[in-house]
């Protein structure tokens, strides 16, 4: 499972930079990989123990992702996944979840 997340993150990081200016669905597509743990559109399954992402303040979520990436915030898998995203991609993901309900 960890390898799948890491592979997905690295693939997206390698291929989406070129497409970012052309794909209006890029934020949604990047955020889709988060559904594996955090639920569809960031609506975590009740009782799963996973934090919901839908409606979380963009700045707060962006800082959390950056903290996972830098290692400042401990995690089991997020520190690996976050390393696969550029700053621009993390901003898109945080923006996407901030407007979800």
Features from the language model and the residues they span:
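Sec-dependent signal peptide recognition
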Residues: 2-9
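Gly/Gly-Pro-rich "capping" loops immediately C-terminal to redox-active cysteine motifs
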Residues: 27, 42-69, 79, 83
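The canonical Cys-X-X-Cys-His
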Residues: 32-40, 93
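Local sequence-structure signature of Cys/Sec-based thiol-disulfide redox active-site neighborhoods
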Residues: 25-31
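Detector for the c-type heme attachment site
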Residues: 38-44, 98-99
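N-terminal signal peptide c-region/cleavage motif recognized by signal peptidases
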Residues: 14-16
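C-terminal capping alpha-helices of c-type cytochrome domains
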Residues: 70-73, 82-101
């Amino acid at each position: 499972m960890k390898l799948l997340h890491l592979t997905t993150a690295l693939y997206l990081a390698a291929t989406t930079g070129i497409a970012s200016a052309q794909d209006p669905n890029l934020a949604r597509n990047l955020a889709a990989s988060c559904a594996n743990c955090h639920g569809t559109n960031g609506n975590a399954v009740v009782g799963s123990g996973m934090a919901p992402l839908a409606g979380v303040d963009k700045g707060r979520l962006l800082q959390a992702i950056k903290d996972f990436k830098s290692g400042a915030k401990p995690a089991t898998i997020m520190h690996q996944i976050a390393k696969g995203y550029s700053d621009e991609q993390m901003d898109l993901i945080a923006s996407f979840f901030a407007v979800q309900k």
